[in-house]
Amino acid sequence: MRELVEAVLGPACFAVRGIFFNKTRSSNWKVAWHQDLTISVRERVHVDGFGPWTTKGGILHVQPSIEVMSGILAIRLHLDESGLDNGPLRVIGGSHRKGRFSAEQISNWGKDKAVVCTVPKGGALIMRPLLLHASSACTVIRSRRVIHLEFAATELPQGLDWHDTV
């Protein structure tokens, strides 16, 4: 996996976040069109262009500058098949190159251009967090487990630190 990340971010890359998603029949959700806009950090430090601040699961998060978000790469490792019936990711290709969108701008995007990302068990999907994406609820009994890892290649500015780095 490191080779994949280095090919995009260079040899100085490191992991900054990991999330486990487990869509099942009993733990099922739909996610509206959005961009991933926050990073997790160790402590609150005022940096121009960073904010608003939130806490999720006891971890401090902030919306960083567009430059920081543009430098992050996500790899989604699929532990189960992600088929049409178990809530696959849908994306709008190229949208990550256009910056950060307001809710109104997102609602005006041509969803007819969406691509459904079916991924086989053991496969990976690579994306930028700023890519417009959504997912539907699972309509079958089987799970859709995904390990979502985010990578960066630069430290944060002015004394702000990533919450975790590997």
Regions found by a protein language model. Name each.
Residues 1-121, 134-142, 149-161:
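Non-heme Fe(II) oxygenase catalytic core, chiefly the N-lobe of the double-stranded beta-helix
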Residues 164-166:
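Glycine- and charge-enriched low-complexity intrinsically disordered segments
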